Amino acid sequence: MEPNSPKKIQFAVPLFQSQIAPEAAEQIRKRRPTPASLVILNEHNSPEIDEKRVTNTQESQNASPKQRKQSVYTPPAMKGVKHLKDQNGSAFPEEEESASEREEKWNH
């Protein structure tokens, strides 16, 4: 290797080993639809179904913002968290474990 050339890093990569048995992988492969079978299934759909799809999308586009489903994350209120903590002893058992471990370390 030349002194000015960038160094190449070589990693020892283990051979890929499948996590599932070959028989299971074969079963999964057989169940998966092929692109050709998907085309055949789509050709058999009746035109009524396609018309229903169009009207549903038009209805959702014409709906007012209040009528559309709003998905907004609302975090739990502190009142609810305190209630859970009182019920179960702790809403966050992981925090209690780490706190007791810290106390043990300080005592020793």
From Swiss-Prot:
GO terms for cellular component: cytoplasm. InterPro entries: PPP1R1A/B/C. Residues 55-73 have a biased composition (Polar residues). Residues 25-108 are annotated as: Disordered. Pfam families: DARPP-32. Residues 45-54, 99-108 have a biased composition (Basic and acidic residues). It is found in: Cytoplasm. GO terms for molecular function: protein phosphatase inhibitor activity. GO terms for biological process: cell division; signal transduction. Belongs to the protein phosphatase inhibitor 1 family. May increase cell susceptibility to TNF-induced apoptosis. This is Protein phosphatase 1 regulatory subunit 1C.
